[in-house]
Amino acid sequence: MHERTFHIMTFGCQMNVNDSDWLARALEARGFTQVPEHEAAIYIINTCSVRDKPEQKVYSLLGRIRRETKNRRNVTVCVGGCVAQQIGKGFFKRFSQVRLVFGTDGAASAPQAIERLVQEPHARISLLDFSEEFPERDAGWENGEVPVSAYVNIMQGCNNFCAYCIVPYTRGRQKSRSSAAVLDECRTLVGNGAREITLLGQNVNSYGLDPHGDGTTFARLLHDVAAIPGLERLRFMTPHPKDIAGEVIEAFGALKNLCPRVHLPLQSGSDRVLKAMGRKYDMARYMDIVTRLKAVRPDIQITSDLIVGFPGETEADFEQTLEAMRTVPFVQSFSFIYSDRPGTRAEMLPGKLSREEKTARLVRLQEVQNEYSEAALQAMVGKTVMVLFESPSPKSAAGSGTDAQNAAEESGRTASSWQGRDEHGFILNVHLPAPADLYGKIMPVTVTAARKHSLTGEPAGESC
């Protein structure tokens, strides 16, 4: 087994996924090779601690790696991300194979640290300090292929300190990236083939409002990125309802390439619970944002995050959340059972609900959401939409017995079934009359059927 082989396992949000993708490029630029898990000498686990469940999965994974590699020499485990920031050097005591822990700001220095681990077999390194400014790093796109749909970090950390949330403690205080650096990376991506960019941050609407900002507001940044020649689609995540400015709402009507889909976390439909959460908005404010968004872009689709079982949540509070879901409604929501996070205000609140009660409420909430998600997909049938293709369709979507996957495997990207998304973010699978390479192409597609989580369609014109 070659000592310069690695495998990355990622938990959590899109920012973690983006960090892992960057780390892979940076290591490959240093001569490391990414391989399947069982072939790797270096295991890198990028962790999430926003809820208890993904954190426990990390400990379970570390235990499995320890068992499965106990007879292998020179196995190195690196733990990064939010759990690493939270637990720190405690990983060294519990897991002998862990030789590097790096926090969210420390990720920028992880490639150099991993290089050192190869050269110094007994070294153990921790990178846990928060930087004063945004931890800028070489994007490394010259070392690999640019994705057709790319993600760009515009900030790090959060200043909101919602009662349930550990992010300000694990990702630090908000640090805005300079607009020049953001625009430079976006131009590089588009110049090398990206057709869609998603701007990432814990609270994108407060971009530029911290001491590290350069005077550029988020609305201004949206306009500047949208103006890059060749950029077909622009998205962003995640905004906070308390900070969304009128100029950002107006951008959905002014910018043709700003996609009509916004993720707007509600968390609860109860004003009483929202206040206890420290969200700093109420349902009236939230619905005003929704109304204004729909006024400037009538076809806009809204998704959300919802927490059930927050301490003290009553049945009446929960019913208000269900009513909010029916009023908006959300085309999709990510719903979670509340879990205590160490050091947060909510951890100390009275009125904790039983696991059984929280689970029952989650089931009810998801039943309501499934109804609206299915209705949104059914409403697309018969419409013609522009689809940006990102990959051959998986077998489950292309249909059993199709040659999509086989063709893709035999000839790279040539396949007769392709998967992509329309501007609203709906996933579409399209079967072609003959194998073709549609990666990065945009094609008009007529939707013919709705599945549980996606759509199927047929070509309605030529790709471009």
UniProtKB/Swiss-Prot annotation:
Residues 378-461 form the TRAM domain. [4Fe-4S] cluster 1 binds at C13, C48, C82. Keywords: 4Fe-4S, Cytoplasm, Iron, Iron-sulfur, Metal-binding, S-adenosyl-L-methionine, Transferase, tRNA processing. InterPro entries: Elp3/MiaA/NifB-like_rSAM (IPR006638), Methylthiotransferase (IPR005839), Methylthiotransferase_CS (IPR020612), Methylthiotransferase_N (IPR013848), Methylthiotransferase_N_sf (IPR038135), MiaB_methiolase (IPR006463), rSAM (IPR007197), rSAM_horseshoe (IPR023404). It is found in: Cytoplasm. Its cofactor is [4Fe-4S] cluster. Residues 144-375 form the Radical SAM core domain. Its EC number is 2.8.4.3. It catalyses: N(6)-dimethylallyladenosine(37) in tRNA + (sulfur carrier)-SH + AH2 + 2 S-adenosyl-L-methionine = 2-methylsulfanyl-N(6)-dimethylallyladenosine(37) in tRNA + (sulfur carrier)-H + 5'-deoxyadenosine + L-methionine + A + S-adenosyl-L-homocysteine + 2 H(+). GO terms for molecular function: 4 iron, 4 sulfur cluster binding; metal ion binding; N6-isopentenyladenosine methylthiotransferase activity. It comes from the Bacteria. One of its GO terms (cellular component) is cytosol. Residues 4-119 form the MTTase N-terminal domain. [4Fe-4S] cluster 2 binds at C158, C162, C165. It is an enzyme of class 2 (transferase). Binds 2 [4Fe-4S] clusters. One cluster is coordinated with 3 cysteines and an exchangeable S-adenosyl-L-methionine. Residues 393-420 are annotated as: Disordered. Belongs to the methylthiotransferase family. MiaB subfamily. Monomer. Catalyzes the methylthiolation of N6-(dimethylallyl)adenosine (i(6)A), leading to the formation of 2-methylthio-N6-(dimethylallyl)adenosine (ms(2)i(6)A) at position 37 in tRNAs that read codons beginning with uridine. This is tRNA-2-methylthio-N(6)-dimethylallyladenosine synthase. It comes from Oleidesulfovibrio alaskensis (strain ATCC BAA-1058 / DSM 17464 / G20) (Desulfovibrio alaskensis). The lineage of its organism: Bacteria, Pseudomonadati, Thermodesulfobacteriota, Desulfovibrionia, Desulfovibrionales.
